[in-house]
Amino acid sequence: MYFGLSEDQEFFQENIKKFLDDNASVDVIRKIATDHPEHQKDIQEGLVSLGINSLLVPEEYGGLGLNILFATAVSQALGSGIAPSAFIGSYVMAPIAILNGGSEDQKKLYLPDIASGKISFAVGFSEFIGARENCEIIFKNGKLNGRSIFVLDSSDASHIMVSDKDGKIYIVSMNSEGLTKNPVSYTHLRAHETPLH
């Protein structure tokens, strides 16, 4: 019995690795890190053109209809290089959540646009996984209030998927009135600079 990757999975991995080798050198990553986000967008668009966004979207919604093992192979390829791009939240967690928890109307609304690259998702499930003080997500009177911290893939997302403490999932456009995004930067954090009390 063979437990390795299939030829198709290896081919997909190799294409991603080659793309990253050609487009995400250490110099490019340094430019991104010094506030040149246009390079990050180019890398993300290139990876989307390879199909990372449509892996888990069924064919009936315009995707490739592949399985989680393909997503794992892609994740491994992204991790083997320097890939400053959205993946786990946008193209793994979001499609799986919509497929397993969304209505047919929601599937028709979101999945084709994920597969085409028209939309992408940030994912904030911290309230359900481990609620933090003053971060409660509350849906009341048709409005969603609260905050979610440590949101995955938020840099260029068009939508955010958040959960409340009971695991109910909500989708909000990143252009929604009252929604704010506060980036957290730890790039200059050093152990000796971090006081412990």
Label each residue range with its predicted role.
Residues V28-I32, A122-G124, H197:
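Short, hydrophobic secondary-structure boundary micro-motifs
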Residues Q9, V74, S103, L144-G146:
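Buried hydrophobic positions in well-ordered alpha/beta secondary-structure cores of metabolic enzymes
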Residues D105-Q106, P112-R190:
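FAD-binding core of flavoproteins
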Residues Y2-D22, F139-N141:
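Flavin-dependent oxidoreductase catalytic core characteristic
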Residues Y2-E7, F12, S80, L179-R190:
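Glycine-rich beta->alpha junctions and the first turn(s) of the following alpha-helix
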Residues H188, P195-H197:
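Single conserved hydrophobic/aromatic residue that forms the stacking wall/gate
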